[in-house]
Amino acid sequence: MDYEFTEDWFSENNPEKVVRQFDEFLSEFKDKPCMFLEIGSFEGMSTIWMLENILTEESSQIFCIDVWAEWTGDAFVRFVSNINKTGLKDKVHIVKGDSSEELRIFPKEYFDFIYVDGNHDEKAVIKDAIGSFRILKKGGIIAFDDYLLGISYPNSPGSKAMNGSTKKAIDYFLDVFQDELEIIHKDYQVWIRKK
């Protein structure tokens, strides 16, 4: 398919090979009715991968929350265009807004999987983590992206401003909820399962 992306933070071309974790840890959901949530969808690269590779059962759906801020340029237009090209747009629910507010609309234990890759500010990450955990089903999985942002690639654009803020926030969340979760992967991304 001829999708349009200006950045590649997800595919095999990405130095962290994050798509490999998605393939490994989400395979249990393939061909099953699932509800997924993505916080921070940008142009839809990870959304499309999940639609085409995991959310293959007819009733599976994904909710995509993003502010699509002005600094992202035409990212929202590209997101909608890319999703339309999949032929699976009926499975995608677009929620344009701040995740800390939008997470409140979902009932407890609603999602099987939640991908957190939104605002990387420490306070925002903590809000996303706690809000996501509330709406995650028991046995469900959360993946936090950019855990080592500003640490493993200190010279990459924007990472100095982050100064490890995502790591601090995720570590705080993991400590507070340690009895209610299992860490299944911890590297550039952190993957947890709710007990």
Predicted regions and their residues:
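A short alpha-helical cap/connector motif
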Residues: 1-195
